Regions:
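N-terminal catalytic cores of peptidoglycan-degrading enzymes
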Residues: 2-111
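Basic/polar, cationic surfaces and motifs that engage anionic cell-wall
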Residues: 9, 13, 17-31, 122-186
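Soluble periplasmic/extracytoplasmic beta-strand elements of cell-envelope proteins
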Residues: 53, 79, 118-120, 158
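Short secondary-structure boundary micro-motifs
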Residues: 63-66, 113, 133, 146
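Short coil-to-beta-strand
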Residues: 110-121
Length: 186
């Protein structure tokens, strides 16, 4: 039953993306839901996706995060949300710019939202709340999928803390094991 729902959702997403007249990626090959956040816009015409920013939600559930990203007054979103059990919710088509990085810079290039994919992982970001095995697997699956289309070396899988300006403005994702993620995402 869940697979059938996923196929229906994938079909609807594909139709919406084609309607935007942009080259569309096939749906992420994971069981996932899609809820289009209003908090996104077009990437600059010359933008090349070459970075993934990993976040911690500081919220307690996928549902709470989805509701936040669906609220236009919040003016925040990410491309994907990953729950504690590894469930994935896509909130913004990869071809669009999600609003996850804020004022940011990577290797001297500002406006990280322009050229990145944002992945939010449900976690309190207190350094004590562990990231689950299922979350690592799901995030790695998303990255493997993205790497089929975009050049995303391990050095371009970064934390929100690493790109936020001014330095120290963000701390997420505290306690996340990037070496483990890179090994799983090969």
């Amino acid at each position: 039953m869940f697979a059938m729902v996923g196929l229906v959702l994938c079909g609807r997403v594909a139709q919406k993306v084609r309607a935007m007249r942009q080259p569309a990626l096939p749906p992420v090959p994971l069981a996932y839901a899609f809820h289009l956040s209003p908090n996104c816009d077009d990437r600059p015409p010359d933008a090349v996706i070459n970075c993934v920013v990993i976040h911690a939600t500081v919220l307690n559930s996928v549902e709470e995060t989805v509701q936040t990203f669906l609220n236009p007054a919040k003016k925040v979103s990410a491309h994907f949300v990953v729950g504690r059990e590894g469930q994935v919710v896509q909130m913004v088509p990869v071809e669009k710019r999600a609003w996850h990085a804020g004022i940011s810079e990577l290797e001297g290039v500002p406006h990280v939202n322009d050229y990145s994919v944002g992945i939010e992982i449900v976690n309190r970001n207190d350094g004590k709340d562990p990231f689950t095995d299922a979350q690592y697997e799901a995030v790695a699956g998303i990255i493997r999928f993205l790497r089929a289309r975009y050049a995303l070396p391990d050095s371009r899988l970064v934390s929100h803390a690493a790109i936020a300006l001014p330095a120290g403005r963000k701390s997420d994702p505290l306690g996340f094991d990037f070496a483990r993620l890179c090994a799983l995402a090969k």
